[in-house]
């Protein structure tokens, strides 16, 4: 997933 920063 490129939205890895959303993996809180």
UniProtKB/Swiss-Prot annotation:
Q: Which residues carry this modification: N-acetylalanine?
A: 1
Q: GO terms for CC?
A: extracellular region
Q: How is it modified after translation?
A: Occurs in two forms, with unmodified Ala-1 and with acetylation at Ala-1.
The disulfide bonds in this chain are none
Which biological process terms from the Gene Ontology are attached to this UniProt entry? neuropeptide signaling pathway
Sorted keywords for this record are:
Acetylation, Amidation, Neuropeptide, Secreted
Q: Does the keyword Disulfide bond apply?
A: no
Grouped into one coarse class, the protein's main location is secreted
The record's subcellular location field reads:
Secreted
- Residues bearing Phenylalanine amide are 8
* Entry annotated with the keyword Acetylation: yes
Family from the record: Belongs to the FARP (FMRFamide related peptide) family.
Protein name, entry field: FMRFamide-related protein 1
């Amino acid at each position: 997933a490129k939205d890895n920063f959303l993996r809180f």
